[in-house]
A protein has these predicted regions:
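Multi-pass membrane proteins that catalyze or facilitate reactions on polyprenyl-/lipid-phosphate substrates
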Residues: 1-136
Length: 136
């Protein structure tokens, strides 16, 4: 399971670095609420579908490398506003046939390094702005 967590995290990190500036330019700096609403609607649909999935029978130990990469890719897509990272990773893990409890576990274990890493990158990227603001 640890190897799959690292593989999913690595995939998220690589794709996230490529998507970050594009997503910020398209969705965040255009001052429109529409992308957020679309993302939230998409998340609601995915979560609704998740409640209907009943093919979960496998344990996390049976998760393949390809499935771990898919989970990492989906998590990177959640960089878009309004899209739930945990909802998407839970959904794709369920789609892989993993038991619901273990899908939640994997999703939240994956969240810890992802969120800490994103916070670190944002802090380093915006450090100049942070120090300038606090100096006022």
């Amino acid at each position: 399971m640890i190897k799959n967590l690292f593989l999913a995290l690595f995939t998220t990190t690589i794709l996230g670095f490529f998507l970050k500036n594009t997503v910020e330019n398209i969705f965040i700096y255009n001052n429109s609420i529409k992308p957020i609403l679309i993302g939230m609607l998409f998340t609601a649909i995915i979560l609704f579908i998740s409640t209907k999935i009943d093919k979960s029978h496998r344990s996390l130990n049976t998760l393949t490398r390809v499935e771990a990469v898919k989970i990492g890719l989906v998590q990177a897509v959640a960089i878009m506003p309004g899209i739930s990272r945990s909802g998407l990773t839970y959904f794709i893990t369920l789609q892989s046939g993993i038991k619901k409890e273990e899908a939640f576990k994997f999703s939240f274990l994956l969240a810890i390094p992802t969120i800490l890493g994103a916070a670190f990158v944002e802090t380093i990227t915006n450090f100049k702005d942070i120090t300038t603001t606090t100096a006022l």
